[in-house]
Regions:
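The feature captures the conserved acid-bearing segment of alpha/beta-hydrolase catalytic domains
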Residues: 157-215
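Alpha/beta-hydrolase active-site loop
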Residues: 64, 100-126
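C-terminal catalytic histidine-bearing segment of alpha/beta-hydrolase fold enzymes
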Residues: 208-270, 377, 386
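The serine-hydrolase catalytic nucleophile loop
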Residues: 58-70, 84
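N-terminal cap/lid segment of alpha/beta-hydrolase-fold proteins
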Residues: 20-45
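Conserved alpha/beta-hydrolase
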Residues: 72-98
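Primarily recognizes the serine-hydrolase "nucleophile elbow" in alpha/beta-hydrolase
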Residues: 117-178
Length: 390
């Protein structure tokens, strides 16, 4: 079934020496284009300098950035965190009371303008250098941070914590290799077993040689990692001190893209005639180095469905089979493979894959809503296939 997306420490140096004492954080009120009230917290630095916009996860509020905001200000980097509409102290219909389709509509139609309003507020503050801005996002905020950079070329650095990226954001990063990206995730992420792989994949697709990944064995999801790992906020401060203060990223500078095996795999697998070569590249590469290619389950699943919906069934089967090999405990990978086998008229294989998906659900770590969707999808195929046998 298709779902929109969601080794360790590559250490950064410690945070830079603290600057002058920054003013106390202050709560601010912003207005969205339609008049909706948005609440934020502004962390002003004591001296002029760059700034960072902080975008929270969809199971938290702007307060989740409190371990980071004051540290940025103390390092001479202004920062603003903001509650999305429907979250925290911001106005709008409560996000947790909306039907999924209504919530997604607001994310698509309203959030970009709301985040732009927060960005405009940030760069208008005294002392903020509007040519050196960063964005940080956790979970659902990852896509929002990347797409903010897509809309505003003065965003020169990103920090992304355990979240997926949408097609527009992915296309932007692959076409903007000068933009440096920091990413972090924990292996015990309760929402995505492959969160570390997802974040390393994003870095590989970006190709910037300055990209950094910080992985943790524990810490759970996104900004939740701040609790057991106070070194993560310090790493993010050090990241922005490097990419916005000491050595600001320059969109006009020549960049030698890191053409990693992961990036090569995706370039091949995204083309109609390149899937076979991509799969062969995968096997050849991992035979030499099992960790050389990073493929997140959700992204490979979406890529497979892209081929399936375009009528390239054989290519879809190749990718879905690879996904079941990489993630053999995932019910969704087998349900997706069942879809492709069914489309190809391979009914016995479709039945086996669907039954395997059902069997895996009892130990699947997905949320209940997602598990129900997988079960419904697999059971529909099983009923059809067993009915056809009668």
């Amino acid at each position: 079934m298709t779902f929109a997306p969601a080794v360790f420490l590559l250490a950064l140096s410690g945070a830079p020496a603290l600057a002058q004492s920054a003013p106390a954080p202050r709560d601010v009120t912003l207005k969205a284009a339609d008049g909706t009230t948005l609440k934020g917290t502004y962390y002003a630095a004591a001296t002029p300098g760059p700034a960072v916009l902080l975008l929270h996860m969809c199971n938290t509020t702007r307060k989740s950035w409190e371990p980071l905001g004051p540290q940025l200000a103390a390092a001479g980097i202004h920062a603003l965190s903001v509650d999305y509409r429907g979250f925290g102290e911001s106005g709008g219909d409560r996000a947790d009371a909306l039907a999924p389709q209504d919530a997604q509509r607001i994310v698509t139609e309203k959030w970009p303008g709301d985040i732009d309003a927060a960005y405009d507020f940030l760069i208008s503050q005294p002392g903020v250098d509007r040519t050196r801005v960063g964005a940080a996002g956790g979970s659902c905020g990852v896509t929002q941070a990347v797409n903010l950079a897509r809309r505003h070329p003065d965003v020169r650095s990103l920090a992304l914590l355990a979240g997926p990226i949408d097609p527009d954001g992915l296309a932007f990063l692959t076409q903007t290799p000068w933009l440096p990206v920091f990413a972090a995730a924990a292996a015990d992420d309760q929402y995505d077993d492959s969160a570390p792989e997802m974040m390393q994949w994003i870095l590989s697709m970006s190709g910037n040689p300055r990209n950094k990944f910080s992985g943790f064995k524990d810490g759970k999801h996104g900004t939740e990692i701040f609790g057991p790992h106070p070194e993560l906020p310090r790493q993010i401060v050090a990241w922005y001190a490097d990419t916005l203060v000491k050595n600001p990223a320059d969109p006009k500078a020549a960049v030698t893209v890191k053409n990693t095996p992961t990036r090569q795999f995706w370039q091949k697998a995204s083309t109609p005639d390149g899937v076979g070569a991509a799969v062969q590249l995968f096997y050849d590469t991992v035979e030499r180095n099992p960790r050389a290619i990073v493929i997140p389950e959700a992204q490979l699943n979406l890529l497979g469905y892209g081929h399936l919906q375009a009528g390239r069934i054989t290519q879809a089967i190749q990718l879905f089979r690879l996904n079941t090999m990489l993630y053999p405990k995932s019910a969704n990978t087998f349900d997706s493979l069942g879809d492709a086998y069914l489309a190809n008229g391979q009914n016995e294989l479709a039945l086996r894959s669907s039954e395997k998906a059902i069997a895996l659900l009892k130990d699947d770590h997905s949320g209940e809503e997602r598990k129900k969707a997988i079960r419904d999808s697999a059971e529909q195929k099983i009923a059809k296939l067993k009915g056809d046998k009668k």
